[in-house]
């Protein structure tokens, strides 16, 4: 069931991110800080929803997810003047660590275990994220191929969800 949950979550976030790519391209959205912050908050609303749903604490996941998105986007914009688009990788890794802590808060576990899961998610998903980064650092001259985007985004999210979900309880054992 854990593998199925991780794959389902990765496919869902792959679809969300592909829809985001479509909106950016179709409506010629310019990359500005406010558009990036909005994008991060919406993406993490969905990711928080996945974590919250799995923990049977959907509303809490939906509330905290966008805050994590804003934090990760702010980290990106703080690092971007120095690292350019390279700042996306540490921001991506930061949000996995934050989502591991959210999962711990919503379920059971210790901060140390959550940080360990978050670091594993950050490194593995960060590597996958780096491997797909060409979809926007070297865009297709004919425009985005949304099937490829969906596959790539799903691939990038899968290691993170596996790290968070494998051998982790789905519910909090106490009242939260």
Indicate where each model-derived feature is located.
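Juxtamembrane/disordered regions of integral membrane proteins
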Residues: 1-176
């Amino acid at each position: 069931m854990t593998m199925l949950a991780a794959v389902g979550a990765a496919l869902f976030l792959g679809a969300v991110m592909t829809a985001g790519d479509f909106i950016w391209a179709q409506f010629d959205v310019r990359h500005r800080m406010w558009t990036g912050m909005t994008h991060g908050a919406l993406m993490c609303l969905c990711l928080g929803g996945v974590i919250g749903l799995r923990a049977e604490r959907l509303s809490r996941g939906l509330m905290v997810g966008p805050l994590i998105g804003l934090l990760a986007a702010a980290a990106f914009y703080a690092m971007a003047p120095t690292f350019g688009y390279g700042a996306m990788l540490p921001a991506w890794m930061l949000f996995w660590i934050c989502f591991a802590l959210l999962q711990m808060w919503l379920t059971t576990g210790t901060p140390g275990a959550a940080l360990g899961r978050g670091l594993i998610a950050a490194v593995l998903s960060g590597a996958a994220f780096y491997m797909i980064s060409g979809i926007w650092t070297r865009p297709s001259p004919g425009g985005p191929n949304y099937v490829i985007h969906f596959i790539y985004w799903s691939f990038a999210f899968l290691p993170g969800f596996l790290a968070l979900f494998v051998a982790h309880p789905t519910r909090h054992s106490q009242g939260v």
